């Protein structure tokens, strides 16, 4: 694995861990009440608060944090909506039309160290209390969004996505990648 990719993955992992550790304290605050802990310039777990703002369309308060060592960025949004969401995204620019980032998107969700079941993603989609769960690959990025009305469930989904992204079973079982990547042309 290249140093650049490893550094990017580490940045995202640190970013998401920090976001999850802040969530309970931030969610306890009212959307209208300013948080003294989130003042611009404050440093929280190695992340500097670089901007506070509002997103009028969603009647939301926003905070942008940047990790001092890695440059990873966290965008935190809080409003009165009871539907909670989590997303982890990676820059995955295409170098050709072979669809390799899309194959990795599928392979990533075919089990992880903590969640070794290859069918767990589909079980989570159809048999749990989520309001949205998916993964998508675009020309420049791959994203793994999930939403739920239950904060406890959302944290479990986030844990599943994080472990799938950073500890995928494809390292242990190369056939998972091959089963997603095979192609037959006439």
Language-model regions, residue ranges each:
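Bacterial N-terminal signal peptides that target proteins for export
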Residues: 1-13
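N- or domain-start disorder-to-order transition segments that initiate the globular core
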Residues: 36-80
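Sec-dependent signal peptide cleavage junction
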Residues: 19-32
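Short, glycine/charge-rich beta-strand/loop segments that flank catalytic centers
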Residues: 124-126, 138-143, 173-186
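Bacterial N-terminal signal peptides
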Residues: 11-21
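M16/MPP (pitrilysin/insulinase) zinc-metallopeptidase core fold and M16-derived inactive scaffolds
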Residues: 78-157
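M16/insulysin-pitrilysin zinc metalloprotease superfamily fold
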Residues: 111, 147-184
């Amino acid at each position: 694995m290249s140093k650049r990719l490893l550094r990017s993955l580490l940045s995202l992992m640190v970013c998401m861990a920090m976001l999850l550790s802040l969530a309970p304290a931030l969610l306890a605050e009212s959307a209208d009440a300013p948080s003294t802990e989130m003042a611009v310039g404050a440093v929280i777990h190695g992340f500097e608060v670089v901007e506070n703002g509002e997103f009028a369309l969603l009647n939301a308060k926003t905070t942008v944090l940047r990790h001092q060592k890695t440059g990873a960025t966290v965008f935190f949004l809080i409003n009165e909506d009871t539907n909670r969401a989590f997303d982890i995204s990676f820059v995955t620019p295409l170098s050709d039309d072979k669809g390799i980032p899309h194959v990795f998107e599928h392979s990533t969700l075919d089990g992880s160290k903590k969640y070794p079941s290859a069918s767990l993603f589909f079980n989570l989609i159809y048999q749990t209390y989520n309001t949205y769960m998916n993964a998508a690959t675009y020309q420049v990025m791959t994203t793994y969004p999930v939403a739920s009305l239950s904060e406890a469930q959302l944290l479990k989904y986030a844990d599943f996505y994080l472990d799938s992204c950073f500890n995928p079973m494809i390292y242990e079982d190369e056939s998972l990648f091959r089963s997603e990547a095979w192609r037959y042309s006439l």
